[in-house]
Curated annotation (Swiss-Prot):
It comes from Haloferax mediterranei (strain ATCC 33500 / DSM 1411 / JCM 8866 / NBRC 14739 / NCIMB 2177 / R-4). One of its GO terms (molecular function) is structural molecule activity. InterPro entries: Gas-vesicle_GvpA-like, GvpA, GvpA-like_CS. Induction: Transcribed from early-log phase, decreases as cells enter stationary phase, probably as a long gvpF-gvpM RNA. Highly expressed in 25% salt, poorly expressed in 15% salt, no gas vesicles are formed at 15% salt. It comes from the Archaea. Encoded in a 14-gene locus called mc-vac. The keyword Secreted does not apply. This is Gas vesicle protein M.
Length: 86
């Protein structure tokens, strides 16, 4: 029997799934000394590709602003005001 090498790499598959589907990580940590709570940490993170983030309504304004800047060479074009049209 000859040894074989698996052609798929687990880390590449993991990153593909993470960017495509995303992940939400939530953690609450309380640091105590002698049963006295000293520090509380609440963490919530969403990790995904920008396509997935904007599909779920996250970073929509940021994405639109940066796309506009890249299309205009770094210049920001003011959006007309609805009241006065300027």
């Amino acid at each position: 029997m000859e040894p074989t090498k698996d052609e798929t790499h687990a880390i590449v598959e993991f990153v593909d799934v993470l960017l495509r589907d995303g992940a939400v990580i939530q953690a609450d940590v309380i640091v105590t000394v002698a049963d006295i709570p000293l520090l509380g940490i609440s963490l919530r993170a969403a990790i995904a590709g920008m396509t997935t983030m904007t599909a779920y309504g996250m970073f929509e304004n940021w994405d639109a602003t940066h796309r506009q800047r890249s299309m205009t060479g770094g210049r920001t074009i003011p959006v007309p005001n609805e009241k006065n049209g300027k």
